[in-house]
């Protein structure tokens, strides 16, 4: 993402919109924590993506997420408060549902570039091959 941001977003050539699409409770928790970060939403999402191996698929996801969240300034109390906010969970799930229902998203990552759908991770070279002809 940093290369994509530098090459296209920061230069105004493209817009990037992140839509939350969690497939499991740990991903839901991650996006909830990002939302609780308020003005630091994207910084928290970035940390969560970079630290994914430390909290996805581990024995104690909640404890692992707490450790990652503490790096972002969460306390035990703010962490618990965030993850027990039912309205927040409902809001995250609503975004996921809309993606599935309206845009037929069924995997992550999924990219929409000029109305076309691309599924799966892509290198900056693969993204550039799609984006550059559209500029």
Task: Locate predicted features.
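C-terminal cap of thioredoxin/glutaredoxin-like
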Residues: 1, 5-6, 66-135
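Structural alpha/beta surface segment adjacent to cysteine/selenocysteine redox centers
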Residues: 1-70
